[in-house]
Swiss-Prot record:
Catalyzed chemical reaction(s): CMP + ATP = CDP + ADP; dCMP + ATP = dCDP + ADP
UniProt keyword Ribosomal protein present: no
Protein encoded by which gene: cmk
Protein name (Swiss-Prot/TrEMBL): Cytidylate kinase
Subcellular location field: Cytoplasm
Organism: Methanococcoides burtonii (strain DSM 6242 / NBRC 107633 / OCM 468 / ACE-M)
SUPFAM superfamilies tied to this protein: P-loop containing nucleoside triphosphate hydrolases
Amino acid sequence: MLLTISGLPGSGTTTVGKLLAEHYSVDIISAGDVFRGLAKERGVTLAEFGRLAESDPSIDVEIDKRQSDIANSSDNLILEGRLAGQMAKKALKIWIKAPLEVRVKRIVDREGSSFDVRMQETVEREASEALRYKEIHSIDIHDLSVYDLVIDSSRWDQFVITDMLKKAIDASGSF
């Protein structure tokens, strides 16, 4: 069974996804890791790479293809990324959300820099991604109607959220 975990930067999707992957002994594929890797390969920041991706649809296509190839080669898999739930056909789809300030603080704690710098980068990145998703895939990233579960990660820590999701996953017979 395929499980998708989506959310905006700093919402906790990667952390929760890794905890679930470990618990269920399944692989996790992260679009963020692919995107960060491609930015690093090109020697640019995430914000710069996001702007580049706005004018170069092949970047999104490459990310989608890498995830799709891996997803199609495994029966049990967690797919983590902002578009994972929008693109997966048969999956248990989860969206993890948190207020912007909470997410930026997490990004600062994880990656360093100042709050103001990370706030600006995050706002720019999210605007860039929303534009790309709309133009390339006709997807409104703010439309959460495709998700089976929406959880606010500012209310609970990653372990409580993981336990909540395990109950939903087990009840659905996903893994």
